[in-house]
């Protein structure tokens, strides 16, 4: 169902028209696409890694059933679709250095499983129906605007929130652990740039 707090706020709300649609409701998605004459869908609906692990059924419903709905609407309405994947789609058996684009993906988390499925389902819709589907495997994304919400790299932001509040923070990551991260504005710019590129590229 509808997620309270999903409405755009502040600068985003003022930047143009907006509508709320539950990605698990195909008719609601189709209605918004038709009403606003949308030609590109940025499907960012997913539970973050930590939350997905504690609510696997909901993670699948939002991440995969929701994607199915978006892809069907895109097929029917002629839309392009961006759905981010993640380095969480890899697993312990994936090469850790110079990881190839096409490689073994055996994630051990529900979040990772949904991301592998996202890649495969998007490829299927491209090959079977010609839907222009595109994706990027993002690392953990951090933001100075959005508070932590259940992602693997949330500690990197949470530590600053704790410092501002004068609270003690115990880092859950073992010393010496390396984690890839990306700044939210850079991730958004990457998604937009990818979708604006000619499909032949």
Regions found by a protein language model. Name each.
Residues 25, 40, 66-69, 80, ...:
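Conserved cofactor-binding/catalytic machinery of classical short-chain dehydrogenase/reductase
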Residues 60-67, 74, 114-115:
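Short alpha-helix in the Rossmann-fold core of NAD(P)-dependent oxidoreductases
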């Amino acid at each position: 169902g509808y997620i309270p707090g999903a409405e755009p706020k502040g600068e985003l709300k003022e930047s143009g028209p907006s509508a709320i649609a539950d990605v698990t409701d195909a008719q609601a998605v189709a209605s918004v696409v038709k009403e606003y004459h949308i030609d590109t869908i940025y499907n960012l609906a997913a539970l973050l890694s930590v939350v997905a692990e504690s609510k696997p059924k909901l993670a699948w419903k939002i991440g995969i059933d929701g994607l199915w709905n978006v892809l069907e609407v895109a097929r029917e309405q002629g839309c392009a679709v961006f759905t981010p994947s993640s380095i969480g789609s890899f697993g312990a058996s994936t090469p850790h250095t110079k990881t190839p684009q096409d490689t073994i993906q055996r994630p051990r988390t529900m979040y990772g499983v949904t991301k592998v499925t996202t890649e495969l389902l998007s490829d299927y819709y491209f090959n079977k129906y010609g839907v222009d589907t595109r994706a990027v495997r993002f690392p953990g994304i951090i933001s100075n605007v959005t508070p932590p919400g259940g992602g693997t790299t949330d500690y990197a932001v949470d530590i600053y929130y704790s410092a501002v509040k004068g609270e003690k923070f115990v880092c859950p990551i073992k010393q010496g652990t390396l984690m890839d991260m990306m700044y939210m504005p850079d991730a958004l710019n990457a998604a937009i740039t990818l979708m604006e590129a000619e499909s032949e590229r």
